[in-house]
């Protein structure tokens, strides 16, 4: 035979980790790993893998949007971006990479964990 045979054991496929999901989406390592965080009602939470999976599954993949926004950025004279319902901060992250910090105004969504990710990564404003 001229091909490689891979043995199948128990017919299982390993689930990707949140870190692997972050890397596939183009986020920095640990982007959604907040440790302990506080919601808008003051309740303290510990970051769970399920919250990370959900937030990453509802986010954008950064590489194609980085390409689009870098081309758009070349034609703009004012480099401030407003990002509504941004989830875990994909668009502000790209915009900050292209233009420096403080150039994106953001508003997150209604779910507590994505709001916490964005607030921790970009500050309250």
Regions from the PLM with identified roles:
Residues 1-86, 90:
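C-terminal target-recognition/interaction regions appended to catalytic cores
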Residues 76-125:
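Core alpha/beta nucleotide-donor-binding catalytic domains of modification enzymes
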């Amino acid at each position: 035979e001229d091909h490689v045979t891979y043995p199948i054991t128990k017919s299982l496929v390993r689930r990707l980790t949140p870190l692997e999901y972050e890397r596939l989406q183009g986020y920095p390592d640990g982007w959604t790993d907040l440790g302990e965080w506080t919601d808008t009602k003051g309740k303290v939470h510990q970051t769970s893998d399920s919250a990370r999976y959900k937030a990453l599954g509802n986010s954008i993949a950064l590489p194609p949007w980085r390409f689009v926004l870098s081309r758009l950025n070349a034609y703009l004279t004012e480099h401030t971006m407003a990002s509504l319902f941004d989830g875990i901060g994909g668009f502000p992250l790209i915009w900050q990479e292209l233009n420096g910090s403080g150039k994106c105004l953001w508003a997150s969504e209604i779910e507590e964990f994505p709001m916490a990710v964005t607030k921790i990564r970009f500050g309250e404003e």
